[in-house]
Regions:
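Conserved, mostly hydrophobic/aromatic
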Residues: 35, 58, 95, 135, ...
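Short, acidic/polar
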Residues: 38-52, 91-93, 128-134, 183-188
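Alpha-helix-loop-beta-strand connector modules within alpha/beta enzyme cores
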Residues: 69-88, 107-110, 115-128, 158-183
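Structural motif
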Residues: 51-55, 98, 138, 171, ...
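N-terminal amphipathic alpha-helix/helix-capping segment at the start of soluble metabolic enzymes
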Residues: 1-47
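Glycine-rich phosphate-binding active-site loops on the catalytic face of alpha/beta enzymes
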Residues: 106-115, 142-156, 181-205
């Protein structure tokens, strides 16, 4: 059952990614699908990573855990062994130290930046058009726009919905990934939204 759910979600993400590549006329270096770790929902991220679809990227987002550097190293090592792109959320120093492929910035960090961090790949979280445009001005590689649907990770946040997601995607030239409440059951609703791919937590557990 888990394998089938993951396969359907990965297929939906690849379909979005293919449409995006056709539109922009160039290949994308980033995966079509990303898994976000979570300190509460994925206390053992290594076990979850083992079950991910082939080619699925990983954003290490365990912020408030003991021995964060050691866990980040283990995650980056596991991703390298499975040929997965690993991005570390937060500062670029930890991402560099553990050998990750890049860094992912939460929106509050994105807003404070005036220049792009010196990392091969830099992505950011965005919840508004202002954040999207700031990421674009900095020359980031992609943004994760959320929450698309209602999500346990942010129960009080107002979901964008398909129309809101589509509208914001059109505001930027950056690749935009849909995040927040994404599952194999609703991913197909974003087929015409112009996104570059999908990202999930619970949808990949």
């Amino acid at each position: 059952m888990t394998f089938e759910r993951h396969r359907k979600l990965a297929d939906a993400a690849r379909a979005l990614n293919a449409k995006h590549r056709d539109k922009v006329g160039t290949g994308m270096a980033l995966p079509a699908l990303f898994f976000f770790t979570d300190g509460v929902r994925t206390p053992n991220p290594l076990a979850a990573i083992e079950k991910l679809p082939e080619g699925c990227g990983v954003v290490f987002r365990h912020y408030d855990v003991a021995k964060r550097a050691a866990l980040a190293t283990a995650v980056a090592t596991a991703c390298a062994a499975q040929d997965r792109l690993c991005l570390v959320a937060g500062g670029a120093d930890l991402a560099t130290n553990v050998g990750a492929g890049g860094v992912h910035l939460p929106e509050h960090m994105l807003r404070k930046l005036t220049i792009r961090p010196k990392m091969p790949i830099v992505t950011a979280a965005a919840h508004s058009v202002d954040a999207l445009l700031h990421a674009q001005d900095l020359g980031l590689d992609a943004v994760f726009l959320s929450p698309v649907f209602a999500t346990p990770s942010h129960p009080d946040a107002v979901a964008l919905g398909v129309e809101g997601f589509t509208r914001l995607v059109r505001e930027t030239t950056l690749p935009v990934y849909g995040l927040g409440g994404i599952t194999d059951e609703n991913a197909g609703q974003l087929a015409g939204g112009g996104g570059a791919g999908l990202a999930a937590i619970g949808g990949l557990l």
